[in-house]
Amino acid sequence: MACGLVASNLNLKPGECLKVRGELAPDAKSFVLNLGKDSNNLCLHFNPRFNAHGDANTIVCNSKDDGTWGTEQRETAFPFQPGSITEVCITFDQADLTIKLPDGHEFKFPNRLNMEAINYMAADGDFKIKCVAFE
């Protein structure tokens, strides 16, 4: 998958928040935020799907360990609207990543790779990043 934005050397530590704000395309089908060590080692593949890959209004999360995908986890909370500005906040610790959605709903995804720092972020799909912040 070609990536719209790739950032490295982030050095995001446990407890710190990565906020990503951007604009969803009016005809959005899906978008992806990948976080981890590099493109083959992802502690989080965050993939909201409006209508893609057989899913509708579902968030699909996964991990990738040395190039091998893990088991998908689906979240039915879906506060995203095509054509709108949206923001996601992601924090992590040794056990889990916590994803805070635009409507305030939070859910957890296991830190399967036991990452102690997130150094890589990639974004792709029907989402134009406007701002990335660390808190």
Swiss-Prot record:
A beta-D-galactoside binds at residues 45-49, 53, 62, 69-72. Its main location: secreted. PROSITE patterns: GALECTIN (PS51304). Keywords: Acetylation, Apoptosis, Cytoplasm, Extracellular matrix, Lectin, Phosphoprotein, Secreted. CDD domains: GLECT. The modification Phosphoserine is found at residue 30. It comes from the Eukaryota. It is found in: Secreted, Extracellular space, Extracellular matrix; Cytoplasm; Secreted. One of its GO terms (molecular function) is carbohydrate binding. The modification N6-acetyllysine is found at residues 13, 19, 29, 108, 128. The modification N6-succinyllysine is found at residue 108. One of its GO terms (cellular component) is cytoplasm. The keyword Cytoplasm applies. The modification N-acetylalanine is found at residue 2. Signal peptide: none annotated. InterPro entries: ConA-like_dom_sf, Galectin-like, Galectin_CRD. GO terms for biological process: apoptotic process; cell-cell adhesion; cellular response to glucose stimulus; myoblast differentiation; negative regulation of cell-substrate adhesion; negative regulation of neuron projection development; negative regulation of T-helper 17 cell lineage commitment; plasma cell differentiation. The keyword Acetylation applies. Residues 4-135 form the Galectin domain. Homodimer. Binds LGALS3BP. Interacts with CD2, CD3, CD4, CD6, CD7, CD43, ALCAM and CD45. Interacts with laminin (via poly-N-acetyllactosamine). Interacts with SUSD2. Interacts with cargo receptor TMED10; the interaction mediates the translocation from the cytoplasm into the ERGIC (endoplasmic reticulum-Golgi intermediate compartment) and thereby secretion. Interacts with CD69. Lectin that binds beta-galactoside and a wide array of complex carbohydrates. Plays a role in regulating apoptosis, cell proliferation and cell differentiation. Inhibits CD45 protein phosphatase activity and therefore the dephosphorylation of Lyn kinase. Strong inducer of T-cell apoptosis. Plays a negative role in Th17 cell differentiation via activation of the receptor CD69. This is Galectin-1. It comes from Rattus norvegicus. The lineage of its organism: Eukaryota, Metazoa, Chordata, Craniata, Vertebrata.
